[in-house]
């Protein structure tokens, strides 16, 4: 399962299909939060709660959206019971300071 951060990323399906032989994958297009480097309050609140609970910071461009999407799908019983889920944290934490500069005018902050 993949989580594109681009809005309108349907083209990725064809691109990926060129390189895979199996049909055991899919892209979840509902977790881009408006597109690349776009955020909303729900995402920021999730990221801050995740860090508080697990002591793991998430970046707002990639990993925060991935974790939000997977946790949302878990809550919706998307995955079969007993499914092993591996999430790979790809970094990006250096972008938090810049994002905070952009979102503080809305009264938001990534902790």
Where are the model-predicted features located?
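Active-site-adjacent helical/loop segments in soluble small-molecule enzymes
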Residues: 27-81
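Glycine-rich phosphate/pyrophosphate-binding loop at beta-loop-alpha junctions
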Residues: 1-25, 29, 33, 88-111
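Conserved beta-strand elements of the Class I
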Residues: 84-86
């Amino acid at each position: 399962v993949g989580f594109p951060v681009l809005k309108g990323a349907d083209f990725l399906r064809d691109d990926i299909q060129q390189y895979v032989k199996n049909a055991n994958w899919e892209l979840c297009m509902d977790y881009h939060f408006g597109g690349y480097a776009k955020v909303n309050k729900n995402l920021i609140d999730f990221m801050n709660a995740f860090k508080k609970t697990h002591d793991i910071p998430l970046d707002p461009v990639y990993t925060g959206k991935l974790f939000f999407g997977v946790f949302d799908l878990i809550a919706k019983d998307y995955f079969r019971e007993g499914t092993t889920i591996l999430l790979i944290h790809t970094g990006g934490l250096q972008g938090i300071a810049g994002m905070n500069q952009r979102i503080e005018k809305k009264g938001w902050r990534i902790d």
